[in-house]
């Protein structure tokens, strides 16, 4: 089992951060895993290193890294740049590539309740 998966089973609370202030708070918290939900190609390496330096696992939402494309090569680029423990994405092609690279993956999905929209018509 992937080390991140084992950690999530033991500690199911995950910090999800978008700002530097939230990252600082998450680094000081007992959470062992941090989901990075906002970054740029210029900042993601430093943010992941801060998380790793604190002894925590870093999972990067690759769709929200400004400056990366939505092509499969983006997974390889991100992995070479900052070595995250895993990625989050809504794109199945990126999820498959990340799995083949040994990264833990979280596929984000949006679910719409179509029955609810019919009630309001």
Identify the residue ranges that each predicted region occupies:
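Conserved small/polar residues in nucleotide/adenosyl-binding loops
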Residues: 119-121
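Conserved N-terminal beta1-alpha1 strand-loop-helix module at the mouth
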Residues: 1-62, 66-68, 83
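Short, Asp-centered acidic motifs that coordinate Mg2+ and/or phosphate
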Residues: 33, 86, 104
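Short, hinge-like loop/turn segments at secondary-structure boundaries
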Residues: 53, 76-79, 104-108
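Active-site-adjacent beta->alpha loops and helix N-cap segments on the catalytic face
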Residues: 38-51, 67-72, 89-103, 112-117
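General beta-strand structural signal in soluble alpha/beta enzymes
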Residues: 15, 60, 87-90, 107
């Amino acid at each position: 089992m992937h080390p991140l998966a084992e950690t999530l089973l033991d500690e199911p609370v995950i910090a999800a951060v978008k700002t530097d202030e939230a990252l600082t708070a998450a680094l000081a918290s007992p959470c062992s895993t941090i989901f990075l939900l906002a970054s740029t190609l210029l900042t993601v390496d430093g943010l992941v290193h801060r998380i790793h330096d604190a002894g925590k696992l870093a999972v990067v939402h690759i769709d929200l890294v400004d400056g990366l494309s939505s092509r499969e090569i983006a997974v390889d680029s991100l992995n070479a740049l900052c070595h995250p423990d895993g990625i989050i994405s809504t794109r199945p092609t990126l999820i498959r590539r990340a799995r083949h690279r040994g990264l833990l993956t979280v596929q984000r999905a949006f679910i719409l309740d179509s029955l609810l929209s019919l009630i309001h018509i």
